[in-house]
């Protein structure tokens, strides 16, 4: 059911994750982009709702999070284009469409405990904070971790908890989780992450090797074992192990 509902957007998702230029909104005069709020509203309407994001709660969450606060100052004027933007240490903040697409795939209803692996700038964690009860994020890069902690604190996200560490290991002290989202590519689910997922829970991640087109998949933990659904072709950087 979930995969079928997302089919109209699949062709757009690969283009977005591969570079985003083809999906950027450049059709409005600069005079209309007067405030981040108006740009955010247009992003939700034209980049998300018009392209297949149907979960009302996801659309509302995307409309509340100030993406410009999660990117370096020199990129803030581009914050609401549907493109990845550099955040330092060779990493990027994902396009709004990709963040919304993955959040929708988690099928959150409110109150859940969610783990994000590769929390980066903290933007996706902020979106998830509007959809779940508590969000736990793991980031390997010390600089990105420190900056995201500061940004989320300034914005008042008290239900987001971040740590620096190896995403392969998850966060056993805060497990179990109803949902896990991984923002970097893996060829298989690490055993610790699977063990930290509750029965009936979902993990969304890009499946495949580095340098190739990967598949965004959602895997549900059932009594009979994992049930995997293929959602869309994507390109993500690979997950790295901690030193």
Curated annotation (Swiss-Prot):
Entry's Gene Ontology cellular component terms: cytoplasm
Catalytic residues as annotated in Swiss-Prot or TrEMBL: 94
Reactions accelerated catalytically: [protein]-L-isoaspartate + S-adenosyl-L-methionine = [protein]-L-isoaspartate alpha-methyl ester + S-adenosyl-L-homocysteine
Ranges annotated as biased composition (Basic and acidic residues): 23-42
Cysteine pairs bridged by disulfides in the record: none
A single GO BP: protein repair
Class of this enzyme: transferase
Top-level taxon of the source organism: Bacteria
Protein name: Protein-L-isoaspartate O-methyltransferase 2
Organism lineage string: Bacteria, Pseudomonadati, Myxococcota, Myxococcia, Myxococcales
This protein's encoding gene: pcm2
